[in-house]
């Protein structure tokens, strides 16, 4: 392949060369590492074999960010780009279901809305079971410890299952607040309003910390018709006033519970977690 590139350069051909390789079970490029070092860009084509969409993710890029992704859907005419991944990820979201919260994460410069699902039920064993799909398992355990210590939810006797709908994987801290709300909503069996979206990092003291690019996240939520956006209070200044969507700033997890559940769909609009 190196010789092929030299030929193109000598003949003045201004074209790109694609080298197709395979990956190991660990998800790394197979064969000698020189294959990865000699190219300008390495792209991984990811996706669950049972899902209709695929994600094109850059892991090396000498000419730009590696945090950008492309979302494609397999149709009868072949792979087609999904122009609005947020709308695609939220399709099929159940209405008025407890344990379901919409959060916003960033993939590079692209805001993506996603549904975070949680199921909390009484454990029948001495050691409660915890499962996380699409989210770091240790992060979920950390956030549940915050809920138990700072909010007072007795989760040590409950099994908990947390999932990002659609099969994508997200490790950005901005989804912390969504995980917290989904677990609390499932524990109380009370749904959060359909028009509410949350984002923010959660610290061990229960504080809600700022995340990057809050303006883009709020703009994406407004574009998809959300009416309430719960954000870190320190981000309110950079977001400013946004017409058509109510932006609420919170300092702590406890404050988030009270504010978010004011907008719950049922059974009563002013019920709070305690």
Residue spans of the language-model regions?
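Positively charged, low-complexity/disordered segments
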Residues: 1-8, 266-269, 273-274
């Amino acid at each position: 392949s190196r010789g092929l590139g030299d030929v193109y350069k000598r003949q003045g051909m201004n074209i790109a060369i694609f080298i197709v390789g395979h990956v190991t079970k660990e998800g790394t490029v197979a064969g000698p590492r020189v294959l990865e070092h000699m190219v300008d860009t390495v792209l991984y084509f990811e996706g669950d074999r049972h899902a209709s969409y695929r994600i094109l993710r850059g892991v090396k890029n000498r000419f730009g960010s590696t945090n950008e992704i492309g979302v494609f859907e397999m149709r009868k005419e072949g792979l087609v780009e999904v122009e609005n991944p947020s709308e695609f990820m939220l399709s099929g979201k159940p209405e008025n279901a407890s344990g379901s919260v919409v959060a916003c994460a960033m993939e590079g410069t692209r805001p993506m809305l996603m549904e975070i699902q949680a199921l909390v039920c009484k454990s029948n064993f001495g050691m409660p079971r915890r499962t996380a799909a699409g989210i770091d398992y240790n992060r979920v355990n950390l956030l549940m410890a915050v809920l138990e210590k700072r909010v007072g939810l007795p989760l040590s006797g409950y099994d908990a299952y947390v999932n990002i709908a659609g099969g994508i994987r997200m490790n950005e801290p901005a989804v912390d607040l969504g995980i917290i709300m989904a677990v609390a909503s499932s524990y109380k069996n009370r749904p959060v309003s359909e028009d509410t979206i949350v984002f923010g990092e959660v610290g061990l003291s229960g504080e809600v910390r700022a995340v990057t690019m809050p303006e883009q996240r709020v703009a994406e939520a407004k574009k998809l018709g959300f009416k309430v956006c719960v954000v870190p209070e320190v981000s309110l200044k950079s977001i400013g006033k946004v017409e058509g969507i109510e932006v609420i700033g919170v300092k702590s997890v406890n404050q988030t519970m009270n504010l978010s559940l004011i907008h719950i769909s049922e059974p009563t609009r002013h019920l709070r977690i305690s």
